């Protein structure tokens, strides 16, 4: 019998579980984390930032109904024109974190989505994580679709993302 998997908002009681899931299922397979060395360790400032984003109430998860464990998730955050995702001074970051965030910031040099769209807020789909044993089942696609639906429902004018991980199209 096929399991019914539902997308649901990330409950505060699951924040720590989701952080552990990210470090277990996302970073060890994510090219930027592997190249920078971030996959091998966690930085408390980065974890604190993830928790701040989770408290915004826009992250989503899929849980296995049999085990009640997270098997996929979308770490999302709300953006404001006046806010920066991290301090401009990267000196407070570990080298691995600094390397990734400076690279991602560099991708947006010369382009300001807020000015382009003439808006003051938006959303970022920061990470899509799927348990390795559940890849190729469309869970990342479902999380993306639900993130878009949530943004529309909330009147958020745009969603941005910097994908760096290939999507698995079929579970071989």
Where are the regions a protein language model picked out?
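A short helix-loop-beta-strand connector motif used in the catalytic cores of GNAT acetyltransferases and
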Residues: 47-61, 72, 79, 84-85
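Conserved active-site alpha-helix within GNAT-family acetyltransferase domains
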Residues: 141, 152-154, 164-172
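Conserved GNAT-fold acetyl-CoA-binding loop/helix
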Residues: 28-47
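A short beta-loop-alpha structural element at the N-terminal edge
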Residues: 5-20
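Conserved beta-strand-loop-alpha-helix junction that forms the acyl-donor binding cleft
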Residues: 126-132, 160-171
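Conserved acyl-donor/pantetheine-binding loop and adjacent beta-alpha core of acyl/acetyltransferases
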Residues: 67-127
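Conserved acetyl-CoA-binding loop-helix of GNAT-fold acetyltransferases
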Residues: 124-130, 135-151
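Conserved GNAT acetyl-CoA-binding A-motif
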Residues: 121-123, 151-164
């Amino acid at each position: 019998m096929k399991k019914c998997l539902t997308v649901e908002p990330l409950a505060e009681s699951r924040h720590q579980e989701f952080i552990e899931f990210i470090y277990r299922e996302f970073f060890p397979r994510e090219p930027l984390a592997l190249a920078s060395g971030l996959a091998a360790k966690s930085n408390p400032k980065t974890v604190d930032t993830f928790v701040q984003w989770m408290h915004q109430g826009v992250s989503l998860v899929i849980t296995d109904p049999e085990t009640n464990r997270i098997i996929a998730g979308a770490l999302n955050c709300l953006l404001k024109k006046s806010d920066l995702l991290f301090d401009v001074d990267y000196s407070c970051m570990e080298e691995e974190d600094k390397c990734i965030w400076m690279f991602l910031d560099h991708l947006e040099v010369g382009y300001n989505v807020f000015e382009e769209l003439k808006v003051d807020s938006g959303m970022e789909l920061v990470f899509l994580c799927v348990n390795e044993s559940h890849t190729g089942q469309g869970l990342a696609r479902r999380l993306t679709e639900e993130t878009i639906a949530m943004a529309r429902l909330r009147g958020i004018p745009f969603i941005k993302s910097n994908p760096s991980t290939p999507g698995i199209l079929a579970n071989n």
